[in-house]
Amino acid sequence: MQLSALTTLSPIDGRYQDKATALRGIFSEFGLLKFRVTVEIRWLQKLAATAEIQEVSSLSKEANDYLNKIVEEFSLQDAERIKEIERTTNHDVKAVEYFLKEKSEALPELAKVSEFIHFACTSEDINNLSHALMLKTAREEVILPEWQKLIDEITRLANEYKTIPLLSRTHGQPASPSTVGKEMANVVYRLKRQFKQLQQNEILGKINGAVGNYNAHLSAYPNINWHKFSEEFVTSLGLDWNPYTTQIEPHDYIAEYFDAVVRFNTIIIDFDRDLWGYIALNHFKQRTIAGEIGSSTMPHKVNPIDFENSEGNLGLANAVMTHLGQKLPISRWQRDLTDSTVLRNLGVGLGYCLIAYAATRKGISKLEVNEQHLRDELNQNWEVLAEPIQTVMRRYGIEKPYEKLKELTRGKRVDEKAMREFIEKLAIPADEKARLQQLTPATYIGAAIELVEKL
């Protein structure tokens, strides 16, 4: 069967392929091979620039330009050649080494030092740095920019609706009012914390040999400070150096990375569900799009499908990334191979994330606040003013203020007239009484507006 969007196994590359395109060049097999080629070439260039390694002369500009061109112009044809070699070697990293040795034959200067390609390296030296570069690239070029788009959209809602009052609900029951914008601001603040945590997450790498002790390195060049050499190389790639590892970099940072993404996603799930609920309560209307159908049998339906789509895909994303975070830091003794197949799925969870983020933004774009309904609902719940009234009563020493308001309001609908009459009978200063009399459920919003403006 010919491969197409209709025949792919995963909906990430099928139905939703346009949503996750930005990750393909990073986490695909092609992307992994390109990063491996990059690391191998940078390692050879580092060796050549080291005077103590006399067997590899300092490379000429022509040789360095040639190597850099292999990285910059790495093509699908190059990747296919590596896969062709792998069919013989049955070893993916060795296939990259042999590919580069083939390439080096075009330049005698490089052919002469081709045995220093992959010098003293274990496969995991190349792999861990490649995976780190993949995650770093994805974070900086895709994930954080996508997060910023969501934060900006929800911030826009916060500012646009900062003055529109909303009947809060705790335990599903009417509670002290807020504003629509303030509820959006709460989400923005939470998301910004996770943004900062992912942004600051260390992305670690190592290049220290088969068990992390530079055994092979020291056997060939015992007078080189390989510990320092390793640090210089890893940091030259823009990564943080991990000096203590077994054969593998232990992947703790990957768990931290995905944990931050999972937390961000969990906040978005909470947001999706709240918006779904607000739509159900008629707090928000959804703008209709010409030609769209909400139900195959009920023509009137306008469903909150975007928030539902987002919630579902974030659940899938979190399931994958939670497994990665729990599995990858565990490896038997100096290493086992269980991480290898799991690491090939680094981009899967993030792919579901991109689908979800696009859906949430689409859902937001359709929202239109139903201000009149919100005000009507507040006007039907004057009992929420029991809180400020009993608090003022406490201030002026009135006996059992809470109990008196409880008797008046608990489990009851109290209208404006009953609340005004209760206030009028209070033995409190006239100016305080007048202030309470002016209060309505729609104006009892505390510092909600100011809090949005301080965001």
Where do the model's predicted regions map?
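Catalytic-core signal marking the mid-to-C-terminal active-site face
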Residues: 2-29, 65-76, 293-455
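A helix-coil-helix interface module used to build multimeric assemblies
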Residues: 2-217, 221-232, 294, 307, ...
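Generic, well-ordered alpha-helical scaffold segments in large soluble proteins
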Residues: 42-47, 99, 103, 138, ...
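Short amphipathic alpha-helical segments with heptad-repeat character
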Residues: 136-144, 148, 185-188, 192, ...
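Conserved helix-loop functional segments at active or binding sites
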Residues: 160-164, 197-200, 204, 235, ...
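Glycine-rich anion/phosphate-binding loop at the beta-strand->alpha-helix junction
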Residues: 194, 246-335
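Active-site-adjacent "gating/activation" loops or surface patches in catalytic cores
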Residues: 226-247, 251
